A protein has these predicted regions:
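A conserved mid-protein helix/loop that constitutes part of the nucleotide-sugar donor-binding site
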Residues: 19-23, 195, 202-218, 325
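Short, structured helix-loop element that forms part of the nucleotide-activated donor/catalytic region
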Residues: 45-49, 157, 222, 227-254
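Donor nucleotide-sugar binding/catalytic pocket of nucleotide-sugar-dependent glycosyltransferases
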Residues: 57-58, 139-185
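Short His-centered aromatic/hydrophobic patch
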Residues: 93-99, 117
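Aromatic "clamp/platform" in nucleotide-sugar-dependent glycosyltransferases that forms part
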Residues: 261, 280
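Short hydrophobic beta-strand element within catalytic cores of glycosyltransferases
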Residues: 297-300, 310
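Conserved acidic donor-binding segment of nucleotide-sugar-dependent glycosyltransferases
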Residues: 312-313, 317-324, 333-339
């Protein structure tokens, strides 16, 4: 590398940098890149802000769930100011607002930029003015991007079918990558008195938590010896948040056990038998990757992102979306498997992770793509780069 290149990562929380991209950043630094991280400050900022090779820039205008055009304009101006000041060679944007307004700011500054669509979330879950507005903004932003990346084929198909982005300027990244060493399987324990099903995710409706609770009720009515556990943080400001009193009610009725929130999920996965995620839509869920890496069978909804990891009857099962009865059936199928079949299902799950979803593989893909992107000429007036 003749000159030291700089890469900027822009997102809505420092937590997401720490959780999903810290290994990638460390890898890029080891290859000679200098790194900028632009994100709001939170308790996770210190996990990376002092790393040699990282320059942290606090974003103060990021109002994640605000619908105010004034807030969005302030964010655009803040990003444009920083981009003109630091002049990175390439920018990666993550999450909706960073993608929308970061892409426009990067284009104005004439800096190549990639929008990474990590999942469509509740914004695209319904039909209404919000979805229509976001689609219009995404169409404009995607025109300004060098490339638009997705974590699954379904999301890419949605964007291209809606003509938000040209197919030739898209790329599917197979997830954020999992640490297969930290998430290493414990010895299989046959003959447990109860089968433990664990759901890891934010406490919001779109994770399929209501369906999980109803499935637990149905299985208990059948007399099955099960434990259903929920691990994740309350997302109180989210429009589809589940009220705390509902979780407390489920716990008091012993339908499920709420385990709270932790940054170290491995011990909880280790104690579980099967990881469940009946989510309505995902990018590529890390909870399933981490569970699979620890040789746990998977049960998830047949929805974008979730279906990517699961081979029916091989490493887990898919249930119909928003269908608690079908979820209960698939959980019952797993429950009744012989111990040897459960063990083999877990082995198959880890093998799939090792074959294509480790953090080392994802970092390698980034390195190849970055080399390619930086080699392209910038089109005058935008951050789009010719690739035709």
């Amino acid at each position: 590398m003749p000159t030291k290149k700089s890469i900027a990562f822009v997102t809505n929380t420092s937590w997401s940098i720490y959780k999903f991209r810290l290994y990638l950043i460390e890898t890029l630094i080891s290859k000679g890149y200098s790194i900028y991280v632009l994100a709001p400050r939170d308790k996770y900022t210190a996990q990376f802000s002092d790393l040699p090779g990282v320059t942290y820039i606090e974003l103060t205008k990021f109002k994640g769930r605000s619908l105010s055009p004034l807030h969005d304009l302030a964010l655009y101006r803040e990003l444009l100011h920083h981009y003109n000041r630091i002049r990175p060679d390439l920018i990666f944007h993550y999450t909706v607002k960073a993608n929308l307004f970061g892409a426009l700011a990067a284009a104005r500054a004439r800096i190549p930029a990639v929008c990474v669509v990590t999942g469509l979330g509740y914004t695209f879950a319904g039909k209404g003015w919000l979805q229509s507005t976001v689609k219009i903004l995404y169409k404009r932003a995607c025109r300004k991007c060098t490339e638009v990346w997705f974590l699954n084929e379904d999301d890419r198909h949605f964007f291209t079918e809606e003509r938000l982005v040209a197919p030739g300027r898209t790329f599917v990244l197979p997830g954020e990558g999992v640490d297969s060493v930290a998430f290493f399987p414990a010895p299989f324990e046959p003959g447990k008195p109860a089968v433990t099903f664990l759901l890891i995710g934010r406490i919001i409706r779109h994770k399929g938590i209501y369906e999980f609770v109803r499935a637990a009720e149905l299985l208990r009515q059948q007399g099955l010896a099960i434990r259903c556990q929920l691990l994740g943080f309350y997302d109180d400001g989210n429009p589809v948040a589940i009220p705390r009193h509902k979780v407390e009610e489920w716990s008091s009725r012993r339908i499920l056990t709420y385990l709270g929130h932790t940054d170290d999920v491995a011990p909880f996965i280790e104690q579980a038998d099967c990881i469940v995620l009946p989510s309505y839509r995902e990018g590529l869920p890390l909870s399933l990757l981490e569970g699979a890496s620890m040789c746990k069978a998977l049960i998830a909804a047949d929805t974008p992102g979730c279906r990517t990891l699961i081979e029916e009857g091989v490493n887990g099962y898919l249930c119909r979306e928003k269908d608690a009865e079908d979820l209960a059936k698939k959980m019952a199928v797993y429950y009744h498997l012989p111990a040897a079949a459960k063990r083999q299902m877990g082995i198959e799950a880890r093998d799939k992770v090792l074959a294509g979803f480790t953090r080392e593989r994802i970092a390698g893909i980034y390195l190849q793509k970055i080399d390619s992107l930086l080699a392209r000429p910038v089109v005058s007036g935008t951050s789009a780069i010719t690739n035709s």
